[in-house]
């Protein structure tokens, strides 16, 4: 069994607190779970009633389509465990002060949730084509992420406040504070671009380890 140190041995840091970005190449096993969501989400996109399940945010009307990823595809996955653990590592790296009594961040992070709403967890898939863009924006929650699922042309993500332009690779994930603004310029090529974004909450109440 791999240790957490072995699982996250390829983490890279970009910038500094309070705007630090954590970059990682997802293990193939985890990335395969992410890619398994493409067809269910594409099926929603291609349905004549797709507007009913449109994930609405700043990117709505700029990306061709965005839809939430159903909870059933996220719950009990290694992906969810990976996300929670790397977020705890992020908090440790920035010396976040709201730690448990034992000094850990165990159960300090959770997927942002929308109970009773079709969006479910605050995790969604973006389908982007020629002419699409994503204007400058930030996210809800406390920690936010981008996963580059399909991007053969490596469409850059721009972080204006850091003066940083990220050239993505498929399977790469960025984790950063929710307030960090970013954008994607208009897509000039014909290829399909697919990304996943999600938002996490930092839980403020003391949690017990059982």
PLM feature spans:
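Non-heme Fe(II)/2-oxoglutarate
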Residues: 1-113, 133
């Amino acid at each position: 069994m791999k240790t957490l140190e072995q699982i996250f041995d390829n983490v890279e840091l970009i910038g500094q607190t309070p705007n630090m970005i954590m970059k990682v190449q997802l293990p193939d096993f985890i990335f395969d779970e992410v890619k398994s969501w493409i067809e269910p989400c594409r099926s929603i996109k291609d349905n004549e009633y797709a507007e009913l399940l449109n994930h609405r945010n700043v990117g709505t009307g700029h990306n061709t389509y965005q839809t939430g990823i159903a909870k059933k595809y996220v719950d009990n996955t290694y992906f969810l465990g990976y996300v929670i653990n790397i977020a705890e590592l992020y908090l440790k790296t920035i010396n976040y002060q709201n730690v448990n009594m034992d000094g850990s961040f165990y159960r300090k992070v959770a997927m942002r949730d929308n109970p009773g709403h079709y969006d479910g967890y605050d995790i969604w898939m973006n389908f982007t084509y020629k002419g699409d863009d994503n204007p400058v924006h930030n996210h809800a929650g406390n920690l936010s992420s981008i996963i580059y699922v399909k991007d053969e042309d490596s469409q850059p993500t721009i972080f204006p406040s850091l003066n940083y332009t990220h050239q993505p690779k498929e399977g790469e994930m960025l984790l950063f504070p929710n307030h960090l603004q970013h954008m994607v310029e208009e897509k000039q090529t014909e290829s399909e671009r697919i990304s996943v974004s999600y938002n996490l909450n930092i839980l403020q109440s003391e949690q017990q380890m059982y």
